[in-house]
Amino acid sequence: CQHCNHAPCETVCPVAATSHGRQGQNQMAYNRCVGTRYCANNCPYKVRRFNWFNYPNNSEFDFNMNDDLGKMVLNPDVTVRSRGVMEKCSMCIQMTQKTILDAKLKGEEIEDGMFQTACSNACTTGAMVFGDLNDKKSKVAALHQDDRMYHLLEHVGTKPNVMYHVKVRNTDEV
């Protein structure tokens, strides 16, 4: 998901299951989704997927996954979606909210690098960076100013919040 500022998937949802959050993430209320798939049809990036499986109680899964004890290993902050709803990357909204709440409870400012998504946390090369574009001192804001930065399908006008860098090529002639 590109977490667009002008997300075409948000406007077509008949039950308002998709909305735009304060941090710029495109969020879903999974318990509100009725699975019309309009959002998937309207997404120019084709990143939304329909959940065909019944994950909470599926006999195809290992016994331990359907056991009450086995279900306790799942992340309690992430909703286990039921069959018949649309799914997409949430940009780890639960981790973003936890970071904000923890800083608020401690009375601290949120510093650059405190926000982490699962993919950026797992990326050992540092190729994935997550942060606040409004903080001019942040690493992600500096990367945003780089001439090599681009957005996918910019001409569509969705104003995505996910950025990419062009591959570095040696342009010096011998």
Named regions from a protein language model:
Residues 2-174:
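Non-ligating segments of multi-cofactor redox enzymes
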